[in-house]
Swiss-Prot record:
Start-end of RING-type zinc fingers: 1220-1324
Region feature Cap helical domain (CHD), mapped onto this chain: 1333-1665
Official protein name in the record: E3 ubiquitin-protein ligase UBR1
Region feature Disordered, mapped onto this chain: 1826-1846, 1893-1950
Gene: UBR1
ZnF bounds (UBR-type): 121-194
Native organism: Saccharomyces cerevisiae (strain ATCC 204508 / S288c) (Baker's yeast)
Family: Belongs to the E3 ubiquitin-protein ligase UBR1-like family.
Amino acid sequence: MSVADDDLGSLQGHIRRTLRSIHNLPYFRYTRGPTERADMSRALKEFIYRYLYFVISNSGENLPTLFNAHPKQKLSNPELTVFPDSLEDAVDIDKITSQQTIPFYKIDESRIGDVHKHTGRNCGRKFKIGEPLYRCHECGCDDTCVLCIHCFNPKDHVNHHVCTDICTEFTSGICDCGDEEAWNSPLHCKAEEQENDISEDPATNADIKEEDVWNDSVNIALVELVLAEVFDYFIDVFNQNIEPLPTIQKDITIKLREMTQQGKMYERAQFLNDLKYENDYMFDGTTTAKTSPSNSPEASPSLAKIDPENYTVIIYNDEYHNYSQATTALRQGVPDNVHIDLLTSRIDGEGRAMLKCSQDLSSVLGGFFAVQTNGLSATLTSWSEYLHQETCKYIILWITHCLNIPNSSFQTTFRNMMGKTLCSEYLNATECRDMTPVVEKYFSNKFDKNDPYRYIDLSILADGNQIPLGHHKILPESSTHSLSPLINDVETPTSRTYSNTRLQHILYFDNRYWKRLRKDIQNVIIPTLASSNLYKPIFCQQVVEIFNHITRSVAYMDREPQLTAIRECVVQLFTCPTNAKNIFENQSFLDIVWSIIDIFKEFCKVEGGVLIWQRVQKSNLTKSYSISFKQGLYTVETLLSKVHDPNIPLRPKEIISLLTLCKLFNGAWKIKRKEGEHVLHEDQNFISYLEYTTSIYSIIQTAEKVSEKSKDSIDSKLFLNAIRIISSFLGNRSLTYKLIYDSHEVIKFSVSHERVAFMNPLQTMLSFLIEKVSLKDAYEALEDCSDFLKISDFSLRSVVLCSQIDVGFWVRNGMSVLHQASYYKNNPELGSYSRDIHLNQLAILWERDDIPRIIYNILDRWELLDWFTGEVDYQHTVYEDKISFIIQQFIAFIYQILTERQYFKTFSSLKDRRMDQIKNSIIYNLYMKPLSYSKLLRSVPDYLTEDTTEFDEALEEVSVFVEPKGLADNGVFKLKASLYAKVDPLKLLNLENEFESSATIIKSHLAKDKDEIAKVVLIPQVSIKQLDKDALNLGAFTRNTVFAKVVYKLLQVCLDMEDSTFLNELLHLVHGIFRDDELINGKDSIPEAYLSKPICNLLLSIANAKSDVFSESIVRKADYLLEKMIMKKPNELFESLIASFGNQYVNDYKDKKLRQGVNLQETEKERKRRLAKKHQARLLAKFNNQQTKFMKEHESEFDEQDNDVDMVGEKVYESEDFTCALCQDSSSTDFFVIPAYHDHSPIFRPGNIFNPNEFMPMWDGFYNDDEKQAYIDDDVLEALKENGSCGSRKVFVSCNHHIHHNCFKRYVQKKRFSSNAFICPLCQTFSNCTLPLCQTSKANTGLSLDMFLESELSLDTLSRLFKPFTEENYRTINSIFSLMISQCQGFDKAVRKRANFSHKDVSLILSVHWANTISMLEIASRLEKPYSISFFRSREQKYKTLKNILVCIMLFTFVIGKPSMEFEPYPQQPDTVWNQNQLFQYIVRSALFSPVSLRQTVTEALTTFSRQFLRDFLQGLSDAEQVTKLYAKASKIGDVLKVSEQMLFALRTISDVRMEGLDSESIIYDLAYTFLLKSLLPTIRRCLVFIKVLHELVKDSENETLVINGHEVEEELEFEDTAEFVNKALKMITEKESLVDLLTTQESIVSHPYLENIPYEYCGIIKLIDLSKYLNTYVTQSKEIKLREERSQHMKNADNRLDFKICLTCGVKVHLRADRHEMTKHLNKNCFKPFGAFLMPNSSEVCLHLTQPPSNIFISAPYLNSHGEVGRNAMRRGDLTTLNLKRYEHLNRLWINNEIPGYISRVMGDEFRVTILSNGFLFAFNREPRPRRIPPTDEDDEDMEEGEDGFFTEGNDEMDVDDETGQAANLFGVGAEGIAGGGVRDFFQFFENFRNTLQPQGNGDDDAPQNPPPILQFLGPQFDGATIIRNTNPRNLDEDDSDDNDDSDEREIW
């Protein structure tokens, strides 16, 4: 059936009737219990979805274009129809409830990508939890511009700074792709590109035709009709839902309680009847209460008939009850669901929940009243109204579902019609029920008919269901000329026309929705409309119309104000330049600002005749006021940042509005100095003032940025008008004056005795404005300000206040004032302190007619005037003992007044100004010490680093980059040496650092050597370049007689008191004054005031002072200043000095200076001659230094060699010295043990003799093939799993620290370790066994290396190295070994269980593992150059370990006995390869346990292997084509060696192959020869390692080199040629002369199981996986890098998430799991089990994970950005991070040598001890790994947040991890975050906690599955399937994961 145009009306009626009468359906009509309610919800959802989809699809005709048949439906019952057949079928609720349908509206996963295409519109896709948000610094207009993973196209952002964030519940947003205003350059949407690729496929044409039906006018009309009806229905339902409104909710409860208590049942029934939802389809069956008299109590005594039926009690979420409070309150309400915790969780998650429901009203009333006694919000709601509200919820969910259908045509139509219906007028307003009469009837006390705001103040609609009048304010022209001390006169309109659209109604009802519905509505409406180019401006305009309503609602009438829609609206709408332009042009900005002012005004008071904001003092549990304040200020700042015309904020109405807002916080927070006792409780009220005033400063700075960017286009008259308004307001305040010297009026005020404020935003604003115009124009604008001191004095008070606090004068006010002062003074983002300096500079310039008055006013404000005038002496001022420190601050202030001139400079361009500021900031941040890029960037104010291009340019100009040297440090930037001279330690930029320490650092860089540091004189940085001409005389006040007197008195104080506290600064100030005078009056000028006041006399006294009085630097500075003064005016100066000190004193001084090379009375000609000689001497010294340097560099060439001592002949027979690491005793007779880590190794791989990739590549050092990425074949994956489980593949790793056995036992007992899990007491390396040792000595044994090679090598022979044992020794070592065997389970538990196993056979197992350890060393050395001898060099510790293991084996057989050679620990089996290195295993076994020479053993082994290899290789090539292809492939990789005639003959003797079709018959032998050499190489190298270990046992001296057959092995083998290496090595280790000789031998082959079917071992490079060259690739192109994946099958949206890890062992992408155990599960199931390394691309970290005991640490990923940074900082700004091979090689070295466990334990330190202890039986159920990050070398590396963690408790080696993942959250107070209380000792108090655990308890984690009884938690997962992880929020994972975490429902996705 098709719907024609004339049928739309009837369809509209059907929709309206169906929705509004849904309560009449029998299935929904009556109340039901909690379980039935859940079934009803599912049925209701399916009913809404089926019906609306059927209607919107033209009676189901177009459903096939939207959905496919659900696969379950076809499988379960093919008879069931896929889609509804008719309207009747669609609304057949019985069919739904009887489960005869399966939802057809499942979205086709194969087409899910289509939903991301957004041709012709913005994307607007809402980010999901776990998905990345991409920001491009170059492309985005600001930080709010983001792209989703589907739209982000890496091609658009090559070489750009692209950074990512992971979407969480708190960092969300929508994709801005397609929004041209959001991007600086056109972007090419990736989703659209994919669509274009698909559209070229002919198979898609049919789908495109099907989609076109949604462009049909009939279908468009249908969509519009359906959406209009559902939105109208939604509005109608929530218009009548006034019960949850905070304005009347309590009144309803009170009224119901009173009616109940007073027995007014009829009135109560009537009241409830009036409140409940009604429409035209209600009938009397739901209630019997009517207005007829027959229902009165008198007519019918039966109350049951009066009470309405079917009512519910609904509890709403709020933000001021915690979990326990809510649970207690719910219990009092006696809910019908016994699971209170589930109810509480639902309230928190959903936002509301039904407490109970009943047909009988009296059954629910008690609970309704009871739950509210504890303050919970509850409503008494009729069942029908609840049903309609649930219907509305599912309608919104249905719309959400529609927005995700992968049909682009449908999306376009649906979204357009959604915008149209929402933005259209709500025409049904008059037809629907008006709640105004109900409110007026029952709440008349709140409903004043004469109040025009009666509707908005109750948050209800006006008459006729219209948007009510808001509290708007209009600023008239008459109020734009000046700023009122209170509030400027404004007009309040009595009426206003609103659009009255559906959108406005839905937003107006925002405070009525519950939490989940509120979020869903916002997620449906805001992204959809904000992404529409057509409806976005309409949406914005309609939001602005009711901005006043929403803002007031948030402040006064919202239960959950943090959920307000206005926040997201501001971000999505007001950040759009077009919208912002419209807002300003329509003057809506004024309405927004006055709406915000209106709310602030509610909390203002009048102080000193001025209206200022005061802290909220009324109870506000929801924090709605704070949220409203912050949101309002953020809105203003956001709009100002998007101003297109910089004149707009300066227009009269706008500037008055902004100034009114700023004025409310001007000096709002005042503090007063406390005296007497210290405060017990510090005042924290300042926080709110600080917070909001900071926002005001941000608004001011935003306005300043806008004006700065478009300075040339601003009307200067607007600037001057603004200056006039502010100065008039600030300058006309009534202040008290006092008279100084009967002639100078200064302002009377005492900072230390009166209330004073830090922050004065208006003063800062005035400073900004004055900076933008010339001083002359600004001065003329001050026409209404007669005394600028009235303005500047408030800034001066702030400066003095900060200084008094800094010196400890306000100590009794507590620490909080110190933090406030620091925040205000040292915060460059505020810029307020420097602006205070600026205003005081202006006072000096503009009040220049009476400079003494200014100086007196400054002295008085600093409370130094009484001292200056002589009324009090120096030691009895108000500051008492802190006077010296306050003067130190005073001098710094005066110096800054004199030298800080940045606000008076004029630059040719904005960039020049910014570059000057950036360079200065960098210089002052780098001079103290070099900094990493991130630290430096954080140190520089944000407004200077918005464009990092400019920052980088300035950084390059002023600094030198120092590359990182270590493996964990960052690169740093160091200030250029030439720039240290430009650093002034008394400048504002150095405010945070002390003068003297800063000066010392600067001098140390300027001085040539340490002795010269004190002699360096720092030059004050004073400049008049680019200065406004009216500011040239800024320093004139310092040349005034009054100020000279101040300086004189201060110098005199220093001399009199012999106090140098402030003398350094004072002399620097004097120096600055002289420098400024020189710039203004010429180089030979000295201020007259400093001549009339004999400053020179005081300088001479300081210069000649004793060394214990003043420091050398002070004396040098005074001497320098005096010298400069004398040079300029010698006669006057000497006359003054002689008058004071006499001739002799002055002559002595002259002589001293002459000895220093300074003639104070020399002529100009003499001075030039002296300087020329000095220059000549300097050049000569320079040549001498160069000569000395040359000699040092070539010292070795000039030294003679005769002094060398030859030590070769000296023999050393003594054994190695053993010292116990614990007791430090080396003389004890106790046996020693060494700690060792004994576990599986991941390095053994099977080989393929026909794979040229294995044999042809050169061993040329560590490498990374970024083209290969991370693909690994299945054989490798299988080998990794086998390596982690097969007992024959274990190795040893040891730190080789010797410990007495008895000391070790005591250590283990004391630390509560076990012998198979402990950390080395010296280096904290994790160990799981000990190896007993004793000293060996070659003395008197006759043993030598040649003997081992030529005659006999066995353990019997080697045991002669032991000294004779006593019987006691035997017993002791025997017991040690017995204990070792027991604790280590024979070093292989499976072998130990064998029936014929005896303790003696342990030596066989140890020998296998020792051979593996040698193999590990050899494999690791393949990565280093030169490969031929790399295994010899830089491996002292490894050889020491090998020697110790061998000694242990020797000692074992010597004490316990020889093993049975009939016993085979790893017997040969047809399908089992125990050891890939079987050939070397044979060599070791024969060498140690057979009385034959080593050469004979090696010869037999290599001969057998070579023959087997050649036969298998040559016979395995079947035809010429195969050979040719193999040869070509091999030649492409490397050089195939040519066989010689001799070698060809030798090869043919073994296998003579004749093959037709070959170009050359020799190529098959060339291949065989080349591959054979590479196959022999590993075993030959291992034999050499074996020999070197033997050499270590019997060498004569420490430095003796390895010599075989008279050849020094390392020198002999050090070359690259493989063939020559093999031949020479074979000559050394076998009985043959070469490989040819080996192959042609006629000796019989030894028969041994190990030499039969020898497995081939991989002989290539073994390392961690190949990584992408750039780490960013994993983030920006994660979908293109096709890695194997491992995740839960329940995880949705996995392809779009960045919270994954990449296993560096096997290359699998491991997705985050809900239980956070993804790493452990991966290692145990699919990879190498014991340990692993995981790359976390999103955070640029590597997680090193140990399975047993479960532990994590985080280290920086081996990627560096261009600034040499690693880790999180490397990618923070989107920098390109490149793989650093050196660091990756270091990580690989840890992995390949089995050193990751030890590295983890060393990093964790003593905390690893807790990890070991908590891994026992008792602790197992409460263990999570301890995530720890490496402490960075750069101390400023930030964001050390806790990372991912895994968990595994191993009961036995075969135990499946799935059986061990259950645990209780925080059962013993120990979790992933560490030990409670932070100390390791606290862990051992867990027993107390455990006793409490057996008590029943509630679960405080609302989002996690609920706790079972604690004892069940303790007993593990077999008693409880829910796994609870502390601090895991399921909402931060995929939502589907939180439903089901049981591993039985999980599988690995590959």
